């Protein structure tokens, strides 16, 4: 049985955690186990679940203290003598790959799961690190073509040296369930409302404040509409202030950070993701699997949509009113005939059970190449 050093950085609620955990839950753990390296300021480490599945959690200093972070990582790696390191930290992979090289780990996988945007404060650092992010890695992965090309370059991608493993979900857990939809809507008092939803970190990247602008325009056209927001982040207070400013507090359900996500996909009538950038977002696949019309910004790769009849891509240059009109049109078209899209999502290659077997095979082939 092979233990893989999985470098998570900050393990917060959201796409990266969901992606890696779905692969871990479904991979054959008699052949491969994951040791998770997480920054100590992570707020959503499922330690109990990981340990029940046979994995281990190592907490290291936050990457803001990069020398201490690398020193602690190095001590653990030397002790455990890994043969595979798999890092999910984008351009920050440079540092973990260097540690892996120092420790003599022969297989060092750098994975890209996101991109960048000029409006994001972190973009300057990402652009500085990007030319060096291939250093010390032996293998390259991405969860979509767009983020693979963004981090590793067209040449490496076109040469077939970047392996794409898609964002994956548990299609059964996230499938459409009308009974669950009705009970959730009853519980939250939204049985007779059009419900627009968003699940994610409340950050500049996710364009949280624009979501509020869109809903403010929408609720003027559809006064009974509700906005359901799940997540937390540095823009929480700014979001709540804007809701108050618009006078729409009674139309917004803000539930903070939650783990019981499937019931809320079922309760919604449309999902909003007007992000400044994404790799291949988990929430998009989950929402479409549950039969939700999905509104992406055009800054998000079109490969993020598994269902042509549900995925809509709109420019961020469009006004909130234009977004609102398109959303209401899609919702009214979909509501009478809503159905799950599990088979389409599976066929598009987003099912965790199938893709985890491919990841296992990839690891096994890399190990075999050492002999």
Name each model feature, range by range.
Residues 14-22, 194, 198-217, 234-240:
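A conserved mid-protein helix/loop that constitutes part of the nucleotide-sugar donor-binding site
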Residues 87-95, 112:
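Short His-centered aromatic/hydrophobic patch
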Residues 257, 276:
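Aromatic "clamp/platform" in nucleotide-sugar-dependent glycosyltransferases that forms part
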Residues 137-175:
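A short, active-site helix/loop in glycosyltransferases that binds the activated sugar's phosphate group
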Residues 2, 6-18, 22-68, 234, ...:
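N-terminal strand-loop element at the rim of the active site
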Residues 240-256:
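Nucleotide-activated donor-binding/catalytic signature segment of Leloir-type glycosyltransferases, i.e.
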Residues 175-189:
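A short helix/loop element that forms part of the nucleotide-sugar donor recognition site in Leloir-type
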